[in-house]
Amino acid sequence: MNGNDLIRVISFNLKRDFGLPLNRSHKWSERRALAAQYIRESGATIIGVQELLPNMREDVSRLLDVDYSVLGFGRYSGIRPQSDEHSDIIIKNDSAKVNLIKTFWLSKEPEHLSRAYYAIFPRICTVAEIYLKDLGRSIRVFNTHLDHICGIARTLGIRVILGYMERFNEERALPTVLMGDFNAKPGSRPVRMLHSQLEEFPGIHLTDVYSRVEPSEVHNTLHNFSG
């Protein structure tokens, strides 16, 4: 894609309640309208969200209405309806349409409900092939939420994602976006892997968007409900 083929994408951890005592303003019921407002006002064509529980998904779909589509599948494949956390991809319908949507697991059996050996929960990645109406072309978007405890599980997750990127590109090469909540610091091994040219994935070349923006525009993605 060249400089004229610009689109806006954002990654947004919506923060589930977890049943812990929270300040009232931190509860999802108090934040949902603001979250939907932020998505609308961002002007983003594609939004990757994390920690999206089924009740939150219903709220987001209702508040964004027909202007957006919320796409993806839960990490428990619907087996646990109340806690089936999603890492969905949201698209703005007047600017994009989805030709393919798929969710896979970040484990050694990524096509089946499973988890990495050291991971507390199953972790997933949602991938979508999205046609951009204004540009007349398609891109592929991966959205994920890596394990919050175990570095080994995060590293495995990145390897699984890169493997899927390579296989998808062998079938049909497309410009690709990877976004999500990596639960990792900039110098950590999972992030370094994404910066490196890995011998086992010779066809994958990723650019860190933080390297393309002014330092004043770089912010920590851990927002702590502060904006």
Role assignments for model-derived ranges:
Residues 124-142, 151-194, 207:
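His/acidic metal-ligating clusters that form di-metal
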Residues 12-14, 144-146, 180-182:
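Active-site metal-binding loops of divalent metal-dependent hydrolases
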Residues 17-22, 110-113, 217:
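A short acidic, helix-capping loop that chelates divalent metal ions and anchors anionic groups
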Residues 1-64, 75-85, 159:
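N-terminal, active-site-proximal structural segment of metallo-dependent hydrolase catalytic domains
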Residues 46-142, 146:
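Structured beta-strand-rich core segments of catalytic domains in phosphoester-bond hydrolases
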Residues 40-44, 61-65, 166-170, 195-199:
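Sec-exported extracytoplasmic/periplasmic mature domains
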Residues 17-19, 52-58, 148-152, 183-191, ...:
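Active-site environment of divalent metal-dependent phosphoester hydrolases
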Residues 69-92, 107-111, 118-122, 171-173, ...:
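Active site of divalent-metal-dependent phosphoester/diester hydrolases
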